[in-house]
Amino acid sequence: MRIGLFDSGIGGFTVLKKVIKLCPNNSFIYLADTARLPYGIKTTNEIKKIAEEISSWFRYQKIDAFLVACNTTNAIALDILKKNLDIPVFDLIGSAASTIQESRVGVLATPSTVKTKAYTNAILEFKPKTFVIEQPCPAFVPMIEMDNINSDDITDVATGYLQPLLKQKIHSLILGCSHYPLIAPSLRKVLPSSVKLIDPAEALSFKLKLFIDSKTSNYSKNKNFVDLKFYVTSNLKHFPNKAKHWLNVFPEVNLVSLQKKGWVS
């Protein structure tokens, strides 16, 4: 099966890694819109325009399913992606919300995602009596993309972001941006051990597996097989090294422009 997914940068690697583990023997096309990183501080209209361009590009790739590996686009433009692609679309926010069991939930997300209250609304739809508090984290994505992950700086920033949530005595914490699982160790240093970390990619991966299983009866016996194609809109030189670091693959990466019709296939 041919599966597409995208993010503004390397955050979607956290989704791709879990999906590959649970759903091997498929082809994956990963698009990183690095030219417009980060998405989390963009306006609603900007994100909607990006969603139009991304869905148009993926239609050209003839994929069978699509994973929204960017929470900001998920929160603002999921309807656009679903309408334009006309194939099964799997999203992080809805997937995570449907699994929540705790009564007091914190969410770390980008400013644009928090502004929509997408996580709050999705969780309350499944569990109306849940207390949800969302915290915008504008500094995280730039720090992660600059590989500033294991420093005291990011722990200090995390401490500041988490304090309002800890004061509300949350039971679980949703990592509401696909970049954030990359700094889970730093977050865990600040969080009490009783607080459960929730990566939405886990629920999304499970839903994708159910879909693939329902459509595919014959799997290759080679469980290590995976076909990966990577595309970026800028920073072509550095992206293979990032893929090697986080995914343990050193792929060929193609440069594309989402504003032009002369796409690389």
Curated annotation (Swiss-Prot):
Keywords: Cell shape, Cell wall biogenesis/degradation, Isomerase, Peptidoglycan synthesis. Substrate binds at D7, S8, Y39, G40, N71, T72. One of its GO terms (biological process) is peptidoglycan biosynthetic process. Pathway: Cell wall biogenesis; peptidoglycan biosynthesis. It is an enzyme of class 5 (isomerase). One of its GO terms (molecular function) is glutamate racemase activity. The active site is at C70 (proton donor/acceptor), C177 (proton donor/acceptor). The keyword Cell wall biogenesis/degradation applies. Its EC number is 5.1.1.3. It catalyses: L-glutamate = D-glutamate. Belongs to the aspartate/glutamate racemases family. Provides the (R)-glutamate required for cell wall biosynthesis. This is Glutamate racemase. It comes from Prochlorococcus marinus (strain NATL2A).
